[in-house]
């Protein structure tokens, strides 16, 4: 059944659902997967908008089943296993298998699409042939119990892409939730040296405006306490140096130090909620209030920037 936004359902407050709502409202015809396990309070909206969701607790899947019956809809679920990253997912794999059987045999409106795993997020655990091989073995046990093949064995996100490129992704993994490597293609190269030369790593460009240019000391003058966020900072005394302040801050990109200036001879000193401070002493460019400065982004800064109400987004076709 093709899903369109139900006009009787309020616009969602969850950013993930807001994005899906906007895509459906724009007429995008596709199957949508909710990447975060659903909030019980949003089940009605989720069932109305989303084709498939990641799940890790049977009680929530029962809520989905009841809501699907009420709306006369079908919904697919992927049960998540925790293979050490300690974010979402079943730690007790036997319980996971038993819950999969319950979904398969007792929920007529919910289809068990498959199982999946998350790695490289909270616990910083790398995807490996071992932990993804464990996922495949769990999938086979589920299949034995339900008497059919699972459509999806989802082996993680962009961090698993390196194994795919190397031909080391375990047989049986047939699904990856790729986003960052398609949008940006930076982090795997920057962190692990993965050759991504066949992808463009300069797709998103952040532009910010200079609001002040002065020569100032590099070490704060006065009694040093904590910064605006309650953190103690380390400062390096390099004497008087030329610097620029830009109208951009943590509220826009989260991690100022992860911004990548596209201008040579420029480094990031730091900033605050709505200010970014650059060292421009070694730059050969002309600097003045009103100058527009370009930055490349990594996953973290891209995630914040695309969700910031203070940043306008322009889509260009080449």
Give the residues covered by each predicted segment.
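Active-site anion/phosphate-binding pocket segments in diverse small-molecule metabolic enzymes
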Residues: 11, 18, 133-318
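Active-site-proximal beta-alpha core segment in soluble small-molecule metabolic enzymes
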Residues: 1-130, 137, 145-146
